[in-house]
Design a protein with these regions (language model features):
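Early extracytoplasmic/lumenal segment of secretory-pathway proteins
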Residues: 47-115
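N-terminal secretory signal peptides
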Residues: 1-21, 25, 32
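Conserved C-terminal helix/tail region of periplasmic/extracytoplasmic solute-binding proteins
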Residues: 15-17, 338-369
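Mature extracytoplasmic/periplasmic domains
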Residues: 45, 282-346
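A ligand-binding cleft/hinge motif common to bilobed small-molecule-binding domains
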Residues: 113-118, 240, 245-264
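A bilobed periplasmic-binding-protein/Venus flytrap-type ligand-binding module shared by bacterial periplasmic
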Residues: 155-162, 197-202, 275-290, 307-310
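Periplasmic-binding protein-like
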Residues: 136, 151-152, 212-222, 260-283
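Extracytoplasmic ligand-binding site segments that recognize negatively charged/polar headgroups
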Residues: 58-65, 102-104, 109-240
Length: 369
């Protein structure tokens, strides 16, 4: 199952292959995500303490060094930062910690994993005497066992050629009479069941805990009119080809569809599911407290977060970033105040406590079990 972070890398490479950006811009944008490959440094750097960041895909260490490592190392000359692009899934983090062979210091993860792994005692708590809580817009982005330098959303995308008066809510998404045609959902319960619950009329401020039985039954109602995606590129393709007339996609893919189709494919922020791009530190990480200093630097870099929004669409989480966002990008920013106001902040704690069981039930249902 492809993660959001992996899809960000793939999306950048697609734009590069289409000639929509040059190599320098590609490297700069990937650096905003902290994406790169670990490489040997100069002999003089060997005496420095190394911080290893694990991400979901990588190209070159030089780009990461230029945009994240160099500013951090300039302020902290005793450290160097390298990348490991080995995909830090919850399972891999758990295996590392339980085996006592931890090689990662900071991992691009999720709120669900932060609560799940943190509850198992496998993560270091964030040291908020080092990491400034005021550098994020709210508690969703600053958790006990992780903090978020970016955000993303699950949103409703539709074909306006088929539906000039398009759907305005998840209730409309489930209304096959008014909006006939095949729907598209992710082959994963997170986001999907949140939307199913909203389609039943549950207010956003009382969405959690989810009524799992009711949400699963709601998906089952339209099962014969559903197709499922496992990667961002696949979700985009389902919509482009018309195999699905509407779907739930990551907002970054929704942006590509809307801009490249000149508005034929549209998306709405209403009832979007806003999620933090959480970074976590495995218990027993080699660099120890230094990982907290790097995390603090990432959250403080509002200008870099805005550049990431411009490049990929990932939303900034630093409150200072809002005033820096160019007007033409506000439409696509999940944390733009007007956009965030009509979304629901996904409850990572609930998902962390329930994901394994609920997702297994969901997969069993959608695969015909």
């Amino acid at each position: 199952m492809q993660s959001f972070q992996q899809d960000c890398v793939e999306l950048a490479l697609e734009k590069f292959r289409r000639g929509e950006m040059d190599r320098r811009t590609l490297l700069a944008g990937l650096a905003m995500l902290g994406v790169g490959a670990g490489a040997a440094q100069q002999a003089a750097a060997q005496a420095q303490q190394t911080i290893v960041m694990a991400n979901w895909g990588g190209l070159v260490n030089q780009a990461f060094t230029r945009y994240y490592a160099e500013p951090f190392m300039a302020a902290n000359p005793g450290f160097r930062v390298v990348q490991d692009s080995a995909s830090p899934s919850a399972g891999r983090i758990r295996s590392m910690v339980e085996s006592g062979r931890v090689t990662w210091d900071l991992c691009d993860s999720s709120a669900t994993s932060a609560f799940m792994l943190g509850g198992m005692g496998l993560l270091n708590p964030v040291d908020y005497s080092v990491v400034n809580r005021e550098n994020v817009t709210g508690p969703t982005f600053a958790l006990e066992h992780g903090a978020a330098p970016y955000s993303y959303s699950n949103v409703l995308v539709y074909d306006s050629r088929r539906f000039p008066e398009g759907p305005r809510s998840w209730a409309d998404f489930w209304d096959l009479r008014r909006f006939p045609g095949t729907r598209l959902l992710r082959r994963d319960a997170t986001g999907t069941l949140d939307a199913a619950q909203m389609s039943l009329g549950t207010p956003l401020d009382s969405l959690y805990p989810l009524d799992v039985r009711a949400a699963l039954a709601r998906v089952r109602e339209i099962r014969r009119n559903l197709v499922f995606w496992t990667s961002g590129a696949e979700s985009e393709q389902f919509i482009r080809t018309g195999e699905a007339v509407m779907g739930q996609l990551w907002h970054t893919r929704a942006k590509v569809l809307e801009t490249e189709s000149n508005g034929r494919f549209k998306f709405i922020w209403n009832q979007g599911i806003l999620q933090p791009g959480i970074f976590v530190s495995p218990r027993g990480n080699p660099a120890g407290p230094a990982a907290q200093r790097l995390l603090a630097s990432m959250l403080a870099g509002a200008e870099y977060q805005v550049r990431l929004l411009q490049f990929f669409g990932n939303g900034p989480t630093n409150p200072r970033a809002a005033a820096m966002v160019p007007a033409e990008f506000r439409r696509f920013n999940p944390t733009e105040p007007a956009n965030a106001a009509v979304q629901v902040a996904q409850n990572g704690r609930w998902w962390g406590e329930n994901y394994a069981r609920v997702n297994a039930e969901y997969i069993d249902m959608v695969t015909g079990g």
